[in-house]
Amino acid sequence: MDTVQSLINITLPQPEIEAPAKLEYDRTRILSIAAVVFLGYLLLRPLFDKRLPLPPAPTRLPLLGNLHQFPASNLWGTYKKWHNQYGPIMGLKYGQRTVISLGSHEVAKDLLEKRSNIYSSRPNFVVAKAFSNDANSALIAYDERWKTHHSLLSTFMNARMAAKYQFLQNIESKQALHDLMSVQGTEWMQVFHRYTISVTFTLAYGERIPELYDERILFIDELTETISSNVEKPKNLIADCFPTISILPSALMRWKKQGKVYHDSAMKFFLDNHAKALQKPGWNWVKESQTSEDANKLDREEVIYLIGVLIEAGGSTMKTFEFFVMASILFPEKVRLVQEEVDRVVGADRLPTWDDSPNLPYLHAFIREVQRWRPIFPFGVPHSNLKEDVYNGFRIPKDSVVLANHWAMDSDHKVFENADDFVPERWLEDSKLPFLAFGYGKRVCPGQHIAKRSLFIIISRTLWAYNITHAYEKGKKVEIDPHAIVQNILAGPVPFKGTFTPRDADRYRILEEEFSNIGQDEANIWDVCKP
């Protein structure tokens, strides 16, 4: 046996120590060669690509596409300039992403409405999905799950239910009008913010938020700011431009951990308020969801998140209120026309109501012009196409990010004469002008019926009650820059100061009386608002 073992040892020597190093060297060579081949493929592919071209755009570089041209500032203005140069549809490349920007109403309608079966999905934004755990109805793909979400939301937000909610909007607007009596500086912004949050919070959870700086409002603000700042961070945008790198571990992709922390924090807030809502004596969205067939098709936590995130979404109307105040200060001659109409129809001894709406055409034109002049979603909410498509000889690859460029469309001089000017009359002179504030096709804003009533009730009553003018400091007028806009996904003006002065003593008295009666009406909210 020892002899056999000796022979084996002689004929089968031990592996050399250098073998692992040699193996590592070979692996490195193979990876290097593969990388060179892949890079060469990417560089040479366009030369042999026989497919239809993408829509025109600034010159693209291999791998990067148009990343080197991504505007560091004035994003919307740059896109509009590009549309003027390249036409109403552009095909940009940001890394692995294809971005199709639609710069005219005609093209947007052709694709997002006439071909809505293709263009009703959402892009797979990996960072945003990490922060929502892929449960935000506004961001999920167009599939059976989205249809269930949409059906559930429709039970809360359809036109019939929105008509019932005006009782609550009436109460909340009276509080807002009273709060405006004592605000200073930029605090008026918080008045409208409280209004929008309290309306949706009351409907969702059965409890009003009467205080301007309630801790729940501050927490919702923190949630909104956290997700906005993280989604728009340049280093996080890289993950959306090159989504394949999202497979890397959390240690390298910090947004994964940040997204989980954010989602857990949001869910705790939603869970706590969801549980409280079930114990409320009156009706609310949480209770309504308990008997919904659509809710039963979804996970419990998904339903809780779906309802909770509506509070944040409802707050977006606040940005339109802020632009309304800006327009009121900058264009007082237009405000006087609104006030003359409201005084003629309503009089001076009561607040406007929704019943007055059909008789206030100039007011409606004024509101529409605010939404056109300063759209709060300058790029809309991005769509995505479920399959490759061809439009006017251009190829639109599957899963493209399709932007309805509201900023370019709403300032298109071919459609809106003197588009840079604030002209409410245009909506009275041409009823066929395109209006896109609430989106396109099957992904229109599900809360639009509630939002329209909120805009009417707040704006009509504010202009009935107040003159809105520049603020003064040390005897000097504080100027407002109409172009000072925060360039986020949701756009709003840079905070500015304004002055709200009751138009006369009688209106001041009426505001006080209406505010004092809120307590009597509050007890009836949930009986009036329920189906």
From Swiss-Prot:
**Compartments, as annotated in UniProt:** Membrane
SUPFAM superfamilies named among the record's database cross-references: Cytochrome P450 (SSF48264)
Q: In which pathway does it act?
A: Secondary metabolite biosynthesis; terpenoid biosynthesis
List GO terms (cellular component aspect). Answer: membrane
Q: What is its EC number?
A: 1.-.-.-
Q: Does the keyword Phosphoprotein apply?
A: no
Kindly state which reaction or reactions the protein catalyses: silphinene-15-oate + 2 reduced [NADPH--hemoprotein reductase] + 2 O2 = gamma-lactone-2-keto[5.5.5.5]fenestrane + 2 oxidized [NADPH--hemoprotein reductase] + 3 H2O + H(+)
Q: What happens when the gene is disrupted?
A: Abolishes the production of penifulvin A.
Source species, domain of life: Eukaryota
As for membrane topology, the entry says: Single-pass membrane protein
Which parts of the sequence bind heme? 445
Q: Which GO terms fall under molecular function for this chain's record?
A: heme binding; iron ion binding; monooxygenase activity; oxidoreductase activity, acting on paired donors, with incorporation or reduction of molecular oxygen
> Which cofactors does it use?
heme
Pfam families reported for this sequence:
p450
Biological process GO terms, please?
A: mycotoxin biosynthetic process
Record field: transmembrane: 30-48
Q: Spell out the family assignment given in the record's similarity comment.
A: Belongs to the cytochrome P450 family.
Protein name per the record: Cytochrome P450 monooxygenase peniB
